[in-house]
């Protein structure tokens, strides 16, 4: 009763369906990149680390994360403790998988919007959502990679507003 609707945007749900197919993909090595050694390797090189994701996870790197945002993220994550906190997000995936697998036993009934980049998670997240919810609205963002708000801002906002307005009725 506390959650009226939920939106998932280009990711995956640990512990749901065949999630390890994504978790173990070689190109997604960063899911397993945490601890002291990775922190030391990235320290002072945050921009280099993030450039890989901003460019390689985009359908077109020229329409990915804008330069001002790149500078902000690199500067912010370069502050003490920030990168370690970011790495912990992925370090928690095994616990998330255990938790989500338990939650998935009771399907969500509220409206769920799933936005997936055509050149990123695509149908995978949509199929996962259908395993955990009974009222799934899904849109594959044509020509977009992982960075939906940067690569397809108008289409993404249109879908979000449409969904929120429909859910509010």
Predicted regions and their residues:
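Flexible "cap/lid" subdomain of the alpha/beta-hydrolase fold that forms the substrate-access gate
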Residues: 2-140, 149, 161-169
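Catalytic histidine-centered segment of alpha/beta-hydrolase-like enzymes
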Residues: 144-153, 157
